[in-house]
Amino acid sequence: MLLETGLERDRARPGAAAVCTLGGTREIPLCAGCDQHILDRFILKALDRHWHSKCLKCSDCHTPLAERCFSRGESVYCKDDFFKRFGTKCAACQLGIPPTQVVRRAQDFVYHLHCFACVVCKRQLATGDEFYLMEDSRLVCKADYETAKQREAEATAKRPRTTITAKQLETLKSAYNTSPKPARHVREQLSSETGLDMRVVQVWFQNRRAKEKRLKKDAGRQRWGQYFRNMKRSRGGSKSDKDSVQEGQDSDAEVSFPDEPSLAEMGPANGLYGSLGEPTQALGRPSGALGNFSLEHGGLAGPEQYRELRPGSPYGVPPSPAAPQSLPGPQPLLSSLVYPDTSLGLVPSGAPGGPPPMRVLAGNGPSSDLSTGSSGGYPDFPASPASWLDEVDHAQF
């Protein structure tokens, strides 16, 4: 608040200190500074109070105020002290800035000319200079700022690793078991006991808590992962059981050949197999055998066991298992022979006195003539099949 003092002139007559009248009295004013009657020729008036000319002074510098003063509350100040105390303050030195002084501004901060300088090199910044304004209103020139950033990056990259001894580690673990998140005074006590820095102690507790949390999470993940694996295995086991049952049904169904034509139907239309009137057992697969039993191009493949076709044959073998009773469909009229050497083909023998037998080619091997007049069996065949393949039609029975 700006107040201007006025000089009041006492116009009372000389020698008359007070004039008493019937209607009232006129008193001599008292000084607000010294609390005495003002008998001077001139009286100063400020803040609606009267002052001696020597009593009206600045509250800070005690300079007598004769023409103009500034007040705040019950105190009176000169112009300089008033702006120093209540005016705009410099962001660097925190002192008031008079309104007549030249200043510099950086965003919302105001500086004295001599305070507008770099805090590192103390160089006063001029108009056009590049600088960085810190959060605490300090100024740093561009060169010093970039140098400080480079040093900080190098120090961060070359930061030495802290080594904790076994005794220090035992002390920290004991404190962690007591409280995983200790208070500040506990960390200070641990720092003094172990000789480690406060920051090191704080980081150790943070890392320890993070490790415990990670271990708990991993344990839960393993537990749930094992549970889901067991569930998947159980579901896979039940599915495999169903598949095995289905495969068993398919395997049983593959034994019968309801859609396969008989050899009589497959043979030539000359009535060669028409004299075979007695049906034989159907082709069957031994229990537990793997793979499918197929009949292709009139040939019988696979190392299976069948009945002997004629008495006195040197190739007699035990009878094959009976075919399933529940399988429908026509049964083939011809059985086959099996030999230790699976590479040999199969040739059925005809009835005595009948036409010469036809050659039946196996699905996966060469043809062979099994109806020879030899009584010794396999040693009578030549070493090479090519030498006897063409002699099958001229074999003697």
From Swiss-Prot:
Organism (species): Homo sapiens (Human)
InterPro entries: HD (IPR001356), Homeobox_CS (IPR017970), Homeodomain-like_sf (IPR009057), Lhx3/4-like_LIM2 (IPR049594), Lhx3_LIM1 (IPR049593), LIM_Homeobox_TF (IPR050453), Znf_LIM (IPR001781)
Amino acid composition bias (Pro residues), ranges on this chain: 316-331
Domain notes per entry: The LIM domain specifically interacts with the Pit-1 POU domain and is required for synergistic interactions with Pit-1, but not for basal transcriptional activation events.
Keyword line: Activator, Disease variant, DNA-binding, Dwarfism, Homeobox, LIM domain, Metal-binding, Nucleus, Phosphoprotein, Repeat, Transcription, Transcription regulation, Zinc
Gene: LHX3
Domain of life of the source: Eukaryota
Function: Transcription factor. Recognizes and binds to the consensus sequence motif 5'-AATTAATTA-3' in the regulatory elements of target genes, such as glycoprotein hormones alpha chain CGA and visual system homeobox CHX10, positively modulating transcription; transcription can be co-activated by LDB2. Synergistically enhances transcription from the prolactin promoter in cooperation with POU1F1/Pit-1. Required for the establishment of the specialized cells of the pituitary gland and the nervous system. Involved in the development of interneurons and motor neurons in cooperation with LDB1 and ISL1.
Region Disordered, annotated ranges: 212-397
Quaternary data: Interacts with POU1F1. At neuronal promoters, interacts with LDB1, in motor neurons LDB1 is displaced by ISL1 and a ternary complex is formed in which ISL1 contacts both LHX3 and LDB1; allosteric structural changes in the DNA binding domain of LHX3, induced by the ISL1-LHX3 interaction, may explain differences in sequence specificity of the different complexes. Interacts with LDB2. May interact with CITED2/MRG1.
Keyword tRNA processing recorded: no
GO CC annotation terms, alphabetical: chromatin; nucleus; transcription regulator complex
Entries under Pfam families matching the protein: Homeodomain, LIM
Post-translational modification Phosphotyrosine, affected residues: 227
Domain LIM zinc-binding: residue ranges: 31-81, 90-144
Residue list for modification Phosphothreonine: 63
Sites of Phosphoserine modification: 71, 234, 238
Subcellular localization: Nucleus
Protein name as it appears in the record: LIM/homeobox protein Lhx3
GO BP: animal organ morphogenesis; apoptotic process; inner ear development; lung development; medial motor column neuron differentiation; motor neuron axon guidance; negative regulation of apoptotic process; neuron differentiation
Disease: Pituitary hormone deficiency, combined, 3: Combined pituitary hormone deficiency is defined as the impaired production of growth hormone and one or more of the other five anterior pituitary hormones. CPHD3 is characterized by a complete deficit in all but one (adrenocorticotropin) anterior pituitary hormone and a rigid cervical spine leading to limited head rotation.
